[in-house]
Structures are given as C-alpha cells and as structure tokens.
UniProtKB/Swiss-Prot annotation:
Guanylate cyclase involved in the production of the second messenger cGMP. Regulates thermotaxis responses in AFD sensory neurons. May regulate AFD neuronal activity such as calcium responses to temperature gradients. The chain crosses the membrane at residues 500-520. The lineage of its organism: Eukaryota, Metazoa, Ecdysozoa, Nematoda, Chromadorea. Glycans are attached at N72, N369, N456. Residues 853-884 form a coiled coil. This is Receptor-type guanylate cyclase gcy-18. Its main location: membrane. Residues 543-848 form the Protein kinase domain. It is a single-pass type I membrane protein. Mg(2+) 1 binds at D923, D967. Residues 521-1113 are cytoplasmic. Expressed specifically in AFD sensory neurons. It comes from Caenorhabditis elegans. The keyword Membrane applies. It comes from the Eukaryota.
Amino acid sequence: MLKTLLFILIFFNIPIIAIEEIPDIKENGEKSSYTQFDNGAKLEVNKEHKRVIKIGHIGAVGVMPNDARILNISKENLIEEGLVGDDIEFEIVSRQACSESFEGVAVAAELYHVHQVRAFIGPYCAAELEAVTKMATFWNIPIISYSSVPNAVSDRSVYKTLARVSSKNTNSIAEATVALLLHYKWLKVAIATNTGSTAFERVSIFEEIMHREGVTIVKKVMFDENTDANEMMNSGQLGDLAANARIIICLFSSTKELSKEFMQATYTMRMNNAEYAYIIPWLQSGTKDLTPWIGADGEMLQRVKDHYANAIIVDDVNGFDDSVVSSFVEKIEKHGMQKSDIDVTNINGYLHLFDSLKLYALAIRKVLNETDNEAYVTNGQFIWNRMRRMKFEGVVSRSSSEENKDAGAIGTVLMDDVADRAPIFSAFYISPNRDKVMKMVNMESELISNCDGLKNKSGCFQLKINDIKSGFWPSEDGSMPLDEPICGYRGQRCSYLLEISVGSLIILLILISVVFFFLFRYCENKQLEKMPWRIFHDDLQFIDEEQVKSMMSVGSVTTKLSNIQTGQKQHAIIGVNTHTTYHRYKQRRPIKFIKEDMQLLTQMKQAVHDNLNPFLGAAFNEKEEMLVLWKFCSRGTIQDIIYNANVVLDEKFHGAFVRDITLGLEYLHASPIGYHGSLTPWCCLIDRNWMVKLSDYGIANPLERWEKQGAIEIAAAKDSDDKSQASQATSIIYMAPELLKNRETNKRRGMDQSWVKQSMLRRQAGDIYSFGMVMYEILFRSLPFRDNTNISELVDYLADGSKTVSPEIQNQMGLHPDLNALLRDCWSENPEIRPSIRRVRLNTEMVLKTKGSLVDQMMKMMEQYANNLEKLVAERTGMLEEANIRADQLLTQLLPAYVANELKMGRSVAPKLYSSATILFSDIVGFTTICSGSTPLEVVNMLNGLYTGFDECITRNKSYKVETIGDAYMVVSGIPEENEYNHSRNIANTALDMRQYLTGYQIPHRPTHRVRCRWGFHTGSVAAGVVGLTCPRYCLFGDTVNVSSRMESTGTPGMIQMSEEAHMHIRAHHPVFTTTERGEVQVKGKGTCRTFWLEDRVGDASTTNYIQNVEGV
C-alpha cells in the first residue's frame, strides 16, 4: 500500500520545474556549462532560525550495521569543524532497502515526497543506484554514492547530479592497471577471465581503456564460472597463454576464488618463472575479503601463497594496510561506539559513508559563501558543480606508514572533474619469502587543467606512478620481465647454433675426462686388488661376543688371569679360521692411496717378529666403512692387565712385559717401517702364551691424512667401545711434545700433515717417549701425573698442541736408580738426547731380569690359586649351611611346617578342604582406649609381650596361629595337620591358658591396669591354602571362620564363648571341660544361635579362681 502511494506521489505531485542554461566558473577559472533545474523548494527554518536541510540516507538490510550512527558521528564532526551549525542544520533520515526488488526506488520516493529531503546518500545496492540516480536527476537534487557503483552510471549527460565517493570501481582500477602496464612498457598482454555478466562487463571496460592507450590484447582465454584448477589445466588454454603472452591480466567475476584456482593451475603447469607476470585487479563485491592465502582462522596458508609467486595485485593504496581500521575505530570510540558495533570487513564502506556527508557539507558551505541564496542550496546541479575538483581530508588522516608516506592515503579525498573520487592505487608484489605483500609502486591521481569532463566524458585526471621498490623481481638482474621474450614466445627469433656447438664440445670434453677418470680408477683398483693386504668384505665373517667367548676357551682349569675381560669388542673371521679384530672407521668417500701408502701397508703385511702382532690387511671403499684388521690376541691388552685389581703383578711380569715391548720396538726401528707411531698400552696385546705383541704400528699417520682429506672419520672410532684403537682421545697423553706442536703448527698453516718432513730418527725418538709412559704404567699401574689429575681435562689441555705437561715420577722409593734415570731420559723435551731403543733394552734387561717364560710363572700361580680355592670353598660351604638353617627356621615360623617343606621342594601347595577343625578368635577389650593414651612404641611393646605369652600357649597345645591384625588374634587346630577329634580340646585348652596368662600379665607402661579379652570359637569344615606369590600367606576360608569371629564379637569380656557345634563336639569327645549354657544370641548373618560358656577344666583350680576374679571385677 505504501509503495502504491509513493508512486502516485511521483507521478501526480510533481512540482513545477524551471529549466535554464547558465554558465558556471570552475575553480581553475575555466567556464563549464550545465543545465540548472529549479525545483522551487524552500528550506524549513527551525526555532533557532537555522535553515534545516534534510538528507536521505538509503542503506541496505543486513549490511553495514549502525551506518545511521556513523552518519550522526560525521554530522557531529562537521559541527565541530564549523561547516554546519551556525546558519544551517542537517537532518538525516535513514532508511534500509535492498531486501526486495527495487525497494530503494520506493524508499527514495518516500524520502523526497514525504520527508522532503534535499540530498541522497546512497543507495548502497548497485542494482538500485541507476534508477534512484535518474529520479534524483529528475528532481534536481544531489545524490552521493558511497559504495561500489556500476559503470552504467558514468555518463554525466544522463546522471547529472551523481557524485561518487567510493575509492574503487571498475573504471578507476582499469585506469590504474593500464597505467601500470604503460609504466613497465607492457604493451602486449593476455586476459584470463570467465563466463558471466559480471566478468563480461569488467573485461569490456578494460578492453576499452587498453584500446585507448594502445595496449594490445594478444590472447583472451575464458573459463567456466564454476571451474577449478584441474579443469583449467585440462582445457589446454594455459598452453595457449604460454605460447602467446608473458603478461597476463586476471579478470574474474570472483576475484578471490577464481584467481586462487588460476594461480594454482599456472603453478602446476610451471608457468611461474621470472618470465611471467600476473596482474590481478583486486575487484571486490563490497566487503573487504581476506586474501586467498589467509585462512578463516587468520593463519597463513604458505602453500597457497607460493602459488601467487610473480603475481602483482592492483588495489587501493591501503588495500593491505589495516592501520585505517584502528584510526577509524579510535575516532568512533570517542562518540561512544565500539569496534564490535561495525563490520570491520566493510571498513571502506564506513569511511566512504563518513566522507559523503562531509563532501555535501563542503559543497553547501561553498554555495552559501558564494551566493547566500537559498534557491541555490536546493539546486542539485549547482551543488554538484561545486563538488567538482574538490579536495579535502577525509575521516582518516594521511597514512604514516613507511610505504604510504609519499602517497595520498585513503584519508585524502580528491574529486575529479565529474565529481567522482579520483583514484589512489598501489601495486603489490607477492613474495613467497615474506609474510606481507610488498608495495612496488604508488599511483596517485593529478587533475588536468584546461579540461572539461562533461565534454570529453572523463574525469580529467592522470595517474602519476612513483616507484617504491626496484630490483625485486626474481630474475637474474632483478629487472621486470618483458611483454615478449627477446627470442619470442617459442624461441623462434634466436639461433642457438653457437651455444649448441660450445655445449657439445664441453660435453665431449667432459665425456673424455670421465672416460680417462674411470680408466685410471679401474687401473688403480686392479692394482689395489693385487695388494697382499687388500681384504674384501665378502671374505669376512663377523662374529658376536658370545661366539668369541666360546672360541677363547682354554681348557678346564681357569684362573683370574684367564678370565680377564678384554676391551676388544669387534671380531671377524677371515677365510676359514683366521680370527681377527678390526678397527672400524666411517668412510665418506673413496680413499686414494699414494705410492708411499701402498709401500707402507705392504711392509706392514710382510713384517714378522715374535713381538709384533701380524697386520692382516684393510677392507675399504665398500659399504661406506673402512676396516683395519689385526690378528686376535686372546689375553687382551696390557691396559686390561694393569688396571685389573684382581691381578697381582710382580717383577717377573714387569720384566717380561718390558722386554717384549723393547724387542718389538727394536725390530720396527730396524725395519723398513722405521717406527711405531702410536705406542700406547692398548696397542700392546697379549697372546695366549702371555707374550706381548705390538699392534697398530705404522698406520696412524695414513689414517690422519685420510681424515684430513675427508675420506674417513676417526672421531667415530674414538667414541666406540673398542679400546684397542689406533686413535683414542687419550692417546694424546703418550705423544711426544714435539709431535703435538708440529701437528698443530701444520694444521694452522693449512699444510698436509704427511709427516714426510719428520726424519726417521725424530719419529723413533717419539716412540721412546711413548715407551717411557707405558713402562711407567707397567711398573706403577698409574700415569706419571699427580693422583688428583683429571685425565679428561688433561687431554683437552694438550689438544691444541700449544701447551705441554711434563710427566713426573710420583713414587721414587721403590724404583731402581737406573730405571729412574732411564725414564727421565725417555721423557726429555729434547728428542736428540733421548736414548736409542737398543740402549733402552740393555738397561731394562740389566735391572728387570727375567728367567724363563711367563708360562712357568703362570703355572705356579695357578697351583697356589687352586689351593686357596679349596679352602675358600670349604669356608663358603659352611656359611651357606648356616644360612639355610636360619632360613628354614624363619620359613616355618611364617608358614606351617608342612606347607614350608612343600614350597622348599619346589612343589605347589594345593588348596584343601578340612571336614572338621576348630578356629579361635580373641580380641582385647578397650584396645582403642589404651592406644589413645599411649605412644605407638608403648602399644607395640604391650602387644609384643601379650602375644609372646599367647604364642607359648599355642605351642603347648599343638595349635597354629594364623595371623594377628592389631589386637585381633586368630588360632586354628586340625589344620594343616589333621588330629581327628583333638582340635576342639586343643582350642579349649589354648583359650583357658590364654585367660590364665592374663591373670599375671601387667601392661608395662600401666602396671595398675589389667588386660581383658574376649574369646570365641567354633567347630566346622574349613578350606585352607597358600595365597600370593610375593609374601605368600596361609589363609582359611569358610563359614566356620565367620561364625568363630561372631562368637568372639558377641562375647563378654573375660569369658570364652563357643557355638553349639563346638559344645557338642567337646561333650562328645572331651567331657573334662565344664561348660554353661548362655542361651540364644542374635548373631549377624546367622540369626538366633544357641551358645555356651567354657568355664574350666575338671580339677583345675587356677581357672576357677580366674573366673571369680573376673566376676568380682
């Protein structure tokens, strides 16, 4: 009904309009003609004599909440700025539309005819703007659009009173995109779009502007509106793009979703290198969408962002800057609103709405200043003309960010020559390596003088582009890509003959080099295969420690020495029965053997001496590891012997060990090998005949060179369990000072440490130094340093080679003077004055005289050990028997003797049902009261004394105590050993003896108090058995247990209560006891039961006296 009325008003209540053509002078002095409509309207005057101008605002249902409040805040700001309030006043009438078809038209008619508004702000919906604008033109009132508007309303010859404050529309962003193309001289482009009216309209606008500016569209591909990345790739159109263009403009109806699919497709098709540039005009339907690589939870989707590599987004200057949100929120908070009151995603809508009212106020103020004529205030075209080329500061001031400091931010509003907001755009480069997009250029509008937008149908502005970043493109020199590659899209413009020729020549030279290399390596490998020390992994059979132990058996007679645990952990068998130990080194690349290496290894293989451990060979260049193999010695190393506290070493051992080491060194120094190079205690092995054999000789220097070349890793061997390595961390202690210094000096100079410059004599002098350290360890079973020396710290101290520590003899009292002098000579810092190995051998043989072999000495020691072992076995056997007796006694106290014997024999004790047995329960009366007035220790002492007496009563009457829990005491007879009918008699005697025992028992800490108890027993069938594995318990089960407990609990202090069954059993088999019937008693779980008191034994005066005493109490 309302809509009908409004349309009647439109067609039948139209005021008389005078039409007049008048010239107007713009700010730049140029004349501009327009048609002026006089609607004859008069303004209302309020009580304060202010002219009231009504403004109609047409919003949208469900969009931009609290938009009316924003307009009121804008109005308050205008009053503060003095634009409104002195002589005029704005009255804003807000209505909502967009919910039904053309509802905004009806709302506009209502606002004009009913409320007599003199200006429109809105409508928000683009579908209703065209119709409402035509009506406003007809009525000659200004209309200001603050949302994204369609291109159809751009013609000012039709829409004569329309001003647009929105900062981004299809026309403006098309102008910015084309300006960017011209800036980078991209005159050949392709367009990727989709079907649908929205995309068609956008493409049409872009094509028109490109044609005007001379940009050629070389290819246009169109996808379905609901397509995805897979369909785009399968369509084959991406290949057409790659064959015809390098600059691609993405114009989709849904910019966010379809561009995401398109960029994923180009990424998959490998169209994401530096030759391609993808320009995405960021056209949005209304609200400010999140970028595609930001998820709903605000987290970045790195994989999606990677797809946008080499993409350029054209958007307004604050498109990726959220600082405007905080500035706007801060302004509205001053007027009582909160951030939650607005839709932040549509922040631009609020900013444009705010600025729309200010634009109208500035135009009104300008009209009043010029004419002070009310007729001009209500003249829509006159006011619209004053909006042209107007510039003012909007709701948000100029951005203060680093990238926006030279650009007009969204707060600066510049209207062009047709009263449209002049665009301010930026181009943003998306870098996968940065969290935020990078602003590359700013595009700010500059008005063109001497230009009439009504005549040439343009805004009379040009975009000025300022470069912010350069050299950022992922090309070799950082320059932007060309619109057409130098060699063409398919490489057809370039000849590659020279490149192909040079490349072929290079490939040929590489192939020749590779052939020569492999030929050389083949010959080298053949030569290595012929070496006597070469061993292949396939010839090795690796064995574990259990297999080694079985192979090391030496017979039935064993001693402490023969059972020494050796440090050699890695064992293998070569061929059939050659037992070896090996050192494993991680190999990172093939080892290159020089001539000196092969000669040395051959000499080591050929070396034969009684005191040298045979070098069996090396396995290398296989399975990423190198193995150095030596013959296995079953007795371990000297280090194992020295630091084993169970081994007693006398002078014979000292002499034999030192003699063998000197003989081995003497042979090495006289052989082609020349020296040992790494003498340590773990390199001195002992075979099954107790002869010392030197190992790891000569190999240390090649290993160190191979490590420096990066072929092997010796550090891995240092950290292993194998203590017989040639390069342990502590081996540095045994090295001569000059060798350490030389090694570090060479390392600092970057020289190859081949030791070639070291003379043979100096290397032999280094062996003498190491021998002195080893001999000291043999004699004193310690290193020649103070007892509090930390070996790890000492190793670190010596590691850099710039510091040395001189060894010292710590115990000179038991050392022969000749050996004292010899050790000092061996440790001399001057290698020239150290003795030769021959002199060392002669001196040691004179002092450490050894007759015979160590085997004879070992046989004597074994005999002594066997004698001592017999005595030790006898002593230990006696101790074991005593322990077994004590254990048996303790076990029989915890469990019945029969059960304990069964468990000791390893047999399980099966549960058993006893047809007749008697169970007794006793309880201390007032136990809680006694405990409350006693300490825990006093309670324990009291119970211990009481239960000790009870235990004697049980033992005397052949009963068995089952358990005690606190003050409760449980006794049984007839279990586990059955005793026919005697169990009731035993229990009766036990109860009477316990009662008799209490007559003389005094509480230790309360001598004046007497302990009183209740007793109760019952006769019946009982099940018994051992329960539990840990702390097994002998437990009783059955109704007899429960009835016995009830006999105790329902009894009287000092009295012994029995069940009717127990009474019948005693009367039938043991009439010596006197009993008295108590009567019927209510028993829990049994109902009414007939019970009896056990009073005495016939002829027992003591128990009678006890009963009299109890009755007296």
